[in-house]
C-alpha cells in the first residue's frame, strides 16, 4: 500500500494543500498516546513530518515531539488549586482556558502547512472531558471550518471481546460521529494481543453477533440485541482499521482510509460548512439591515417633530438640515431675543444730524435779525 506523500511532493504537484487534521479520541487506556507516538514516528520515516499538538494538560510526559503543548500555556495543578477543582474539573477548566487562545493555534497550523501534510491532535484520557465540553466543541469546529478534519476513534480490541462491551464502544463511537458530523475512522488498537477480525465479523454479520449474544442471558444482552439492529446502518458506512500501536502494523491501511476520509470531507463536509458560513453571514447582514431600517424610522419621526405648525409656509427640516444650518438658526434666535427690538436699526446716526443742524441755523438767523432791528 502506498505511503503518504511527503510535503515536498505535495508542493511540486501544484502548491501546498491544507493539512489533514487527525483528531484522536478514545476511552482511557485504549492507547491513544501510544498510537499518536507510533503515528508520528511512521510519518517521519516516510519523509512527511506531522505537526503534533498535545491537548492533555494532566499528562506527566509526552512520548512524542509536540509542536504545541497545552502544558506550556496552562498549569493543570495550579488551576486545580486556584479554583478548588478535582482532576476532571481541572482538565475541563484547563481546556476552557486554552480554547480562548485557539485562534493562535490556528495561525500556527496555517504557517506549518507548507511543511506538514498532517496535524496530529492527542486529546485527554477522559474522552467525555473533550467530547462533551464546550471547549472541545470550539476546538473541533475551529479545525473543521478551515482544514480537512477527521475523527479517529481508538478502541481497545482486547477489552471488546465481550459483545456487550463491544456494543458499548460502538454506541459511543456512534454518538461522537453524530455530535461532530465529521469523517470518522474506528482504529481497533492492540491487534498484537488479539486479532480484530472477530469485531469486523460482528459488524458485517448480524447473525454472528446474535450467536455471541446468545451466550449472555442478562437483561443487558437483550437490550444489546435490540440495539444491534439499529446500528446496522451505522456499520455499513463506518471505516474500520486494525492497528497495533506497539508493533506499528496496519498504518499503511490507516492512511488509505485517511485519504478516503479527506476526499469525503472535501466532497460532503466542506460544502456544508461553506453553506453554514454563508447562512450565518446572511443572517448577520439581515440583522444589520433591520437595525438600519429601525434607525431610519426613528430619524424620520424626529424630522416630523421639528416641522412647523399647520398652515405655515416654511418647509419641514430634515435632521441633516438641522445640523448644517444650526449656526444660522442660532443667529436668528439671538436677533429675536435682543433687548433693542424697539429701535429702528434702519435709521443711522448721520440721518439724525442733518435736521438738527438745519434747526440750529434757523434759530441763529432769527436771533441776528432781531438784534439789527
UniProtKB/Swiss-Prot annotation:
Modified residues (Phosphoserine): 301, 312, 314, 338
Binding site for GTP: 29-34, 189-192
Alphabetical list of InterPro entries matching this protein: AAA+_ATPase, Gpn, Gpn1/Npa3/XAB1, P-loop_NTPase
Localization per Swiss-Prot or TrEMBL: Cytoplasm; Nucleus
Keywords in alphabetical order: Acetylation, Cytoplasm, GTP-binding, Hydrolase, Nucleotide-binding, Nucleus, Phosphoprotein
Sites annotated Stabilizes the phosphate intermediate: 88
Entry-annotated residues carrying Phosphothreonine: 328, 340
EC main group: hydrolase
Location, primary (coarse class): cytoplasm
Basic and acidic residues bias: start-end ranges: 343-355
Record-linked Pfam families: ATP_bind_1 (PF03029)
Motif (Gly-Pro-Asn (GPN)-loop): 86-88
Annotated GO MF terms: ATP hydrolysis activity; GTP binding; GTPase activity
Alphabetized Gene3D superfamilies for the sequence: P-loop containing nucleotide triphosphate hydrolases
Record-stated family: Belongs to the GPN-loop GTPase family.
Role description: Small GTPase required for proper nuclear import of RNA polymerase II (RNAPII). May act at an RNAP assembly step prior to nuclear import. Forms an interface between the RNA polymerase II enzyme and chaperone/scaffolding proteins, suggesting that it is required to connect RNA polymerase II to regulators of protein complex formation. May be involved in nuclear localization of XPA.
Subunit structure: Heterodimer with GPN3. Binds to RNA polymerase II (RNAPII). Interacts directly with RNAPII subunits RPB4 and RPB7 and the CTD of RPB1. Interacts with XPA.
UniProt name for this protein: GPN-loop GTPase 1
Lineage: Eukaryota, Metazoa, Chordata, Craniata, Vertebrata
Amino acid at each position: 500500500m502506498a505511503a503518504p506523500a511527503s510535503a515536498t511532493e505535495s508542493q511540486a504537484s501544484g502548491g501546498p494543500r491544507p493539512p489533514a487534521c487527525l483528531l484522536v479520541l478514545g476511552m482511557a487506556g485504549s492507547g491513544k498516546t501510544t498510537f499518536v507516538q507510533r503515528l508520528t514516528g511512521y510519518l517521519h520515516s516516510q519523509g512527511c513530518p506531522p505537526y503534533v499538538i498535545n491537548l492533555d494538560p494532566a499528562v506527566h510526559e509526552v512520548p512524542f515531539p509536540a509542536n504545541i503543548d497545552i502544558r506550556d500555556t496552562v498549569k493543570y495543578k495550579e488551576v486545580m488549586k486556584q479554583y478548588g477543582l478535582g482532576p476532571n474539573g481541572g482538565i475541563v477548566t484547563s481546556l476552557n482556558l486554552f480554547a480562548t487562545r485557539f485562534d493562535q493555534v490556528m495561525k500556527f497550523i496555517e504557517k506549518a502547512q507548507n511543511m506538514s501534510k498532517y496535524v496530529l491532535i492527542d486529546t485527554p484520557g477522559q474522552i467525555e472531558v473533550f467530547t462533551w465540553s464546550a471547549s472541545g466543541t470550539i476546538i473541533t469546529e475551529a479545525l473543521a471550518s478551515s482544514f480537512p478534519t477527521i475523527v479517529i476513534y481508538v478502541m481497545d480490541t482486547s477489552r471488546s471481546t465481550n459483545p456487550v462491551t463491544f456494543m458499548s464502544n460502538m454506541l459511543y463511537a456512534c454518538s461522537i460521529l453524530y455530535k461532530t458530523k465529521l469523517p470518522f475512522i474506528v482504529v481497533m488498537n492492540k491487534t498484537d494481543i488479539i486479532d480484530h477480525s472477530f469485531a469486523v465479523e460482528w459488524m458485517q454479520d448480524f447473525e454472528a453477533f446474535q450467536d455471541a449474544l446468545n451466550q449472555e442471558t442478562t437483561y443487558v444482552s437483550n437490550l444489546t440485541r435490540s440495539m444491534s439492529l439499529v446500528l446496522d446502518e451505522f456499520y455499513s458506512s463506518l471505516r474500520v482499521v486494525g492497528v497495533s500501536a506497539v508493533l506499528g502494523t496496519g498504518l499503511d491501511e490507516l492512511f488509505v482510509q485517511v485519504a478516503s476520509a479527506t476526499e469525503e470531507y472535501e466532497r460532503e463536509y466542506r460544502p456544508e460548512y461553506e453553506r453554514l458560513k454563508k447562512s450565518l453571514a446572511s443572517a448577520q447582514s439581515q440583522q444589520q439591515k433591520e437595525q438600519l431600517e429601525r434607525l431610519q424610522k426613528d430619524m424620520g419621526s424626529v424630522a416630523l417633530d421639528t416641522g412647523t405648525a399647520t398652515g405655515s409656509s416654511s418647509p419641514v427640516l430634515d435632521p441633516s438640515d438641522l445640523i448644517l444650518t444650526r449656526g444660522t438658526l442660532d443667529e436668528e434666535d439671538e436677533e429675536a431675543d435682543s433687548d433693542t427690538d424697539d429701535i429702528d436699526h434702519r435709521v443711522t446716526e448721520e440721518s439724525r444730524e442733518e435736521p438738527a443742524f438745519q434747526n440750529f441755523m434757523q434759530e441763529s438767523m432769527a436771533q441776528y435779525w432781531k438784534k439789527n432791528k
